[in-house]
Swiss-Prot record:
Protein origin, superkingdom: Eukaryota
Pfam families reported in the protein's UniProt record: PCI
GO CC terms in record: transcription export complex 2
Family indicated by similarity: Belongs to the CSN12 family.
Gene name linked to the record: pcid2
Organism: Danio rerio (Zebrafish)
The protein, known as: PCI domain-containing protein 2
């Protein structure tokens, strides 16, 4: 395959199209396939030869693909992106003409995946040279993917087996990757609605569903919807294939903070297994109610947490740490009328600096408001009066 002639290559593409062999045709259009390294196929002007053997718009699609292999061989990623855009546009013309059939879905998966990758590469290349607007290439790629998505989503005539709707989730996952990269998470909302209302949502491949739930979970986390976030990320982690350790680790980076905010602390073994010991001190600090240790852990691993986009989420653990510390005070004093001074002493003992009784009241008021403590502050008596039943409700029970 790596040394076939242009004629042989075009003949194979033609046969795949004529026999409706979407999977083989997808390989012939994919940059994961070895044919792209064949110098005989890396051509700057293959149009004439393609027109001789292939019908429009396939001739245009294949010619653009071969021009793309030429651009990649010259490390011209901006040109490769432009060629791949033509590949997707030409494919879409053919795809729309396929009424009530979906054999070409594998081709769509291959060409749209490569489009996103080339847009990413082109973007990085331009940024290194200080050219172009940040996110511009990826946004344009997203527009092309949305055109494909609309064709899939609007296919209401075909029977379920021949429906183009089977392509929706793959495209949504590619769009999620772009929207997260360019920080436009609000654009995910209509796509999530489209899947929520789809009767195929539980029928897509498990790999696609794992990816989808991962991004939906991350979005819910950023929206502070921690219970739906836990649900989605837990689904992804549980159903992610056990051989995909790297992906499982990636899911855990977001699942761990969510679980911790809901009161579930990870074990040392889990952190060790997935090389996430950055969370070890954070976990210990929250469990012990140790603000000093928590701040030190956040500072120590700040670069890692910021790079993962979870630093601000982890900062929310401070209020949980206060709750756990104050719960210890409650257990020590064994009364439902707790002097505010006792909380002040507990903070001072954990080396929290510059704290006074007013700040203690402020922290307690926040904890009561958030439902972490059932009770009220008696300003007259300078006491926290807590409920006799379950004054510190489980974090997982708080909406």
């Amino acid at each position: 395959m790596a040394h076939i002639t242009l004629n042989q290559y075009l003949q194979q593409v033609l046969e795949a199209i004529d026999s409706r062999d979407g999977s083989f045709c997808a390989e012939m259009m994919s940059f994961k396939h070895p044919h792209v390294a064949n110098p005989r196929l890396q051509l700057s002007s293959p149009e004439e030869k393609c027109q001789q053997l292939l019908e429009p718009p396939y001739d245009e699609m294949v010619a653009a693909h071969l021009r793309c292999t030429f651009a990649v061989s010259n490390h011209d990623f901006v040109e490769a992106y432009k060629c791949q855009t033509v590949v997707v546009q030409s494919f879409l013309k053919a795809f729309q003409a396929h009424k009530e059939e979906n054999w070409a879905l594998p081709i769509m998966f291959a060409v749209t995946l490569d489009l996103r990758i080339f847009a990413n590469n082109a973007e990085q290349h331009l940024q290194q040279k200080g050219k172009g607007k940040v996110g511009d290439m990826l946004e344009k790629a997203a527009e092309q993917l949305m055109s494909c998505f609309r064709v899939c989503a609007s296919d209401n005539r075909a029977g379920i087996d021949d429906s183009k709707k089977w392509g929706m989730l793959f495209l949504i996952n590619q769009l999620f990757k772009i929207y997260f990269k360019i920080n436009k998470l609000h654009l995910c909302k209509p796509l999530i609605r489209a899947i929520d209302s789809s009767n195929l949502k539980d029928e897509y491949t498990m790999a696609q569903r794992v990816t989808y739930k991962y991004y939906v979970g991350r979005k819910a986390m950023f929206d502070s919807d921690f219970k739906p976030a836990e649900e989605c990320l837990s689904f992804s982690f549980t159903h992610c294939h056990r051989s995909c350790q790297r992906n499982k680790r990636l899911i855990l980076i977001y699942l761990l903070p969510v679980k911790m905010l809901l009161g579930h602390m990870p074990t040392h073994q889990l952190l060790k297994k997935y090389d996430l010991m950055q969370f070890a001190d954070v976990t210990r600090a929250v469990s012990e109610g140790n603000l000093l240790l928590l701040n030190a852990a956040l500072v120590k691993h700040e670069t890692f947490f910021i790079r993962c986009g979870i630093f601000l989420i982890l900062e929310k653990l401070k209020i949980i740490t206060y709750r756990n510390l104050f719960k210890k005070v409650y257990h020590l004093l064994r009364t439902h009328q707790l002097p505010l001074a006792a909380f002040l002493v507990s903070l001072q003992m954990t080396k929290v600096e510059d704290v006074d009784i007013d700040e203690v009241q402020c922290i307690l008021a926040n904890l009561i408001y958030m439902g972490h403590i059932k009770g009220y502050i008696s300003h007259q008596h300078q006491k926290l009066v807590v409920s006799k039943q379950n004054p510190f409700p489980p974090l997982s029970s708080i909406s």
